[in-house]
């Protein structure tokens, strides 16, 4: 569901900026193909175990280049491959479409994490600081709509994809809140440890069998 939401947000932004919607959607649909079970928790444990480390964006590129179609790969164009690789990490994609997916991914995952935390009883709607909600919206749909429209308006006529200062600052504050209230929450950390232990055990099993 995360990938489909990223694709929907990214395509909406691309349409609003009169950019290549198909290229944007292709990057979005491929961006997390190499992700581990349990998301970033799984990625961290594989990064510790594997001699060369592990990055899910690099694995996503490996999936489309080397693993699909029984090793033949999908023969994707440079722009799609580069967008997949650069949706996270220090390097930005050269295309605006690739940059759109990068920001759409951030919009989607933080809102998805909020929903998960609320379903798990870790946080409640009124826990989100009021100054953040007044800028971004008070529910999932409101935040998605606000952030999507903001990227379109802030990026129109520019040579890069960006957010307005107000929404960028609110997003940064929201991330800080999520780290304090959710990501470092003892309940969430306990579940993360279970997930990491499971992946480590599976890795050891497949290595020895």
Where is each model-derived feature located?
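Histidine-centered, transition-metal-coordinating active-site segments
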Residues: 1, 7-13, 18-22, 54-209
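Active/ligand-binding-proximal structured segments within catalytic/core domains
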Residues: 3-5, 42-43
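Aspartate-rich (DDxxD/NDxxD/DxxxD) Mg2+/diphosphate-binding motifs
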Residues: 23-49, 57
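Catalytic phosphate-handling regions of large nucleic-acid enzymes and associated NTPases
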Residues: 1-2, 35
